[in-house]
Amino acid sequence: MVLAKINNKFFNYYIFICLVTSIFFLYHKFQFPTDWTTSEWLINYQGGFTRRGLGGEINIFLTKFFAISLRDAILTIQLVIFILYLILLFFYIKDLKLNIFQIFALFSPLFLLYPIAELEALGRKELLIFLFYICTLFFCEKKFKPIIVNLFIFIFFPIVCLIWEQIIL
């Protein structure tokens, strides 16, 4: 099977279009006060310890620290997570040699286009799992010492678990 490198110019445009349309849809999604993905980020520890309350506590802290609205804090957190995810994914994939099936999988609506194709998936906490995974791959690929990779995993994995509890199931 022939392996090919992705055309960087096309891939750059593709990632940029995914990024811009995701930001556009995420911003417009926040205009509706009944969106449940916003309330998912509001769960906090004020009513007692819950496994997924750290995200809400971080948003409340950002609201008080920067004197912004809670909706703006949630939108900012979601945008930062999504932008970091796409940037790290771009740097991880751009130099890989892929076969035709992997290229089709990469450009399918089930991978990079999924948050755009299914707006309910845009801005959800599951993106933290993907971001954590791609960060771990990034550290492993860049030939960091195993102690640094292990420290990254042991520090950030519990934080991700306290934000999104399904990861521990």
Name each model feature, range by range:
Residues 46-80:
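Short hydrophobic/aromatic helix or loop-helix immediately within or flanking a transmembrane segment
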Residues 76-100, 135-139:
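Transmembrane-helix motifs of polytopic, lipid-linked glycan transferases
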